[in-house]
């Protein structure tokens, strides 16, 4: 869990847009933290950060785009508390956060597109199920056709 990346995307809940924040371990592409909420805020990012199971002191770097949800006092204080260095993409360069962008392409294709979430609670429940499936069952070509959890177990 040395380097983690994150981003946000939107998902339809009822008739409104809600947001999902994912934290991905760059080493094995495992989704290690997530949150869902009605607003695209620093609190949503913070909720995803505190959902990470494991020692946050093991994280050396946190990379994101330059969105205000990531670059603010709340997140800065949390990162400082655990000695995590922040890395921000260059302005106007989404390729700097390519792993997170690719993750959300997969997420939208496999999870969000065509899904009907009538409540935020239903979204959160199905998001937890998806994360479990993604980490423990779904194989990844970049990981030698192992799941993220299998890859971590075999290499550490």
What does each model-found stretch correspond to?
Residues 1-156:
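Charged DNA-binding/catalytic regions of mobile-element recombinases
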